[in-house]
């Protein structure tokens, strides 16, 4: 089972919150104190809460569930994308489009258009167009890929959202809440934990902290998927009893 230790979190700077003047009182239970005007997050809470969240994500993945990684802040985008791809899951790393979950029918049409344009770009269709028309379609393809590339193969709504920065991604969290999709989110001292099912109190800006969260969630999803494949193989008669 994937777990993260106190040492891992200390080394990554998970405990450093925001300046005290920007705090959200709803995060008070998770704050240890303050140092040099910066809130210090109590890792005695964060360690078990994150490990509980990892166990939940692993369980979702073990049932063929879809995990959607969400992190559109500049610091989080790259790590979110890499982690999601590494565990064969899905991501939104650029901008959360309003209705991405609650208006899935429309999003599905945009994904269909994206796939059409992808096919046209490789089957020679673009070469037969005028220069202007080809350029317009290329731009449309790039725009759609940027917005929807990480969810184009999701094939339906996700089973869990993993979010870096609850404050920044409040629209995504609200949409998930409306649809009853569980949310795991890193919540810093300046944010509200509202609508988050699995709260991970921690720094949501430092690259090392973000990498720790994303790689751990990816490992948990992979481990869960591995359990699913092992069970499937056993059912199919591929695993011999010792």
Swiss-Prot record:
Keyword Aminoacyl-tRNA synthetase among record annotations: no
Keywords assigned by UniProt, alphabetized: Ribonucleoprotein, Ribosomal protein
CC annotations in GO: cytosolic small ribosomal subunit
Lineage of the species this protein comes from: Bacteria, Pseudomonadati, Pseudomonadota, Gammaproteobacteria, Alteromonadales
Family: Belongs to the universal ribosomal protein uS2 family.
One GO term (biological process): translation
Name of this chain's protein: Small ribosomal subunit protein uS2
Pfam families registered for this protein in UniProt: Ribosomal_S2 (PF00318)
Listed GO MF terms: structural constituent of ribosome
Gene3D superfamilies to which the protein is assigned, alphabetical: Glucose-6-phosphate isomerase like protein, domain 1, Helix hairpin bin
Database matches in SUPFAM superfamilies: Ribosomal protein S2
Biological source species: Shewanella sp. (strain W3-18-1)
